[in-house]
Curated annotation (Swiss-Prot):
Gene field: lipA
Domain Radical SAM core: 74-291
Protein name in UniProt: Lipoyl synthase
HAMAP family reported for this sequence: Lipoyl_synth
Its EC number(s): 2.8.1.8
Length: 315
């Protein structure tokens, strides 16, 4: 029997999703999939960032989601902070973040986060979170508290938030964000609508699009952003259709990257997309009117987020 208080990962986490994972032959990684390990000064900076995070009892999605770019990003002194704990209330079978019953919110986290960002002298920061379906506002007020504290401690720091879908709490969450909107509002669509039941149990494609559009309607000067994975069984045409939907919902920025299976208990990789196809996605995105598009095998939602925001005119 599941122990909801224990953090579940891999096969244990995905054992109870509605559509079971169908095993597939493991594909050989092509030459263009390369995980970069830091060395020298970059390795020292990597260890320094990890130590700083542990000292302040903070989590990063870089670590919790086993991001392949962690050595490069930490080595450059950048990190995507994950607030509200490291236990998610969802069981998405592409994601390596643990599932279970989350701990109560830490009221000191916004201040601790702001102090850490100030100590690291970050010009650009991404703040994300686990899903918190146990909270009445989905965690929106905690996001706003983190934005406020960070702005107070680091007025020149640009803040991007990567938010969950606030399922059943959208209106409450959007009203709360009126208190202190971020500089960039990011919510990932993740995949095409046909694959939502398999890849995003508990989420709804149209609902996620509406979240992005309604935030933009309330804050037309704040850039909106979304990200997609490829390799889950979608077609190129389906990806292009999602891109059109995003533009129709006034989304400004786009990321598309290759899905990599975190473990045998997660969804398998069904195809490796060639860099030429990523280039096609990027070209089409700009033609559709996205202000910036980052598309490539190792691109992740917050990978080089500062450079993407600069390209879109935010910083």
């Amino acid at each position: 029997m599941d122990n909801p208080a224990r953090k579940q990962r891999g096969a244990e986490k995905t054992a109870r999703i509605p559509i079971k994972i169908v095993p597939a032959e493991r594909l050989k990684k092509p030459d263009w999939i390369r995980i970069r390990l830091g060395a020298g000064a970059e390795a020292e900076r990597f260890n320094e960032i990890k130590q700083t995070l542990r000292e302040h009892k903070l989590h990063t999605v870089c670590e919790e989601a086993s991001c392949p770019n962690i050595h490069e990003c930490f080595g450059k002194g950048t990190a995507t902070f994950m607030i509200m704990g490291d236990i998610c209330t969802r069981r998405c079978p592409f994601c390596d973040v643990g599932h279970g019953r989350p701990e109560p919110l830490n009221p000191n986290e916004p201040t601790d986060l702001a102090r850490t960002i100030a100590a690291m002298r970050l010009n650009y920061v991404v703040i994300t979170s686990v899903d918190r379906d146990d909270l009445r506002d989905g965690g929106a007020q905690h996001f706003v508290d983190c934005i406020r504290e960070t702005r107070a401690a680091s007025p020149s720091t640009t803040i991007e938030v990567l938010v969950p879908d606030f399922r059943g709490r959208m209106e409450i969450a959007l009203e709360i964000f009126n208190q202190a909107p971020p500089d960039v509002m990011n919510h990932n669509m993740e995949t095409v609508p046909r694959l939502y039941k398999q890849a995003r149990p508990g989420a709804d494609y149209a609902y996620s699009l509406r979240l992005l559009k309604e935030f933009k309607a309330g804050h037309p000067d704040v850039l909106t952003k979304s990200g997609l994975m490829v390799g889950l069984g979608e077609t190129d045409d389906e990806i292009l259709d999602v891109m059109r939907d995003l533009r129709a919902h006034d989304v400004d920025m786009l990321t598309i990257g290759q899905y990599l299976q975190p473990s045998g208990g997660h969804l398998p990789v069904l195809r490796y997309v060639h860099p030429d196809t990523f280039k096609m996605f990027e070209t089409e995105a700009l033609r559709m009117g996205f202000r910036n598009a980052a598309c490539g095998p190792m691109v992740r939602s917050s990978y080089w987020a500062d450079q993407q925001a600069h390209g879109a005119g935010v910083v």
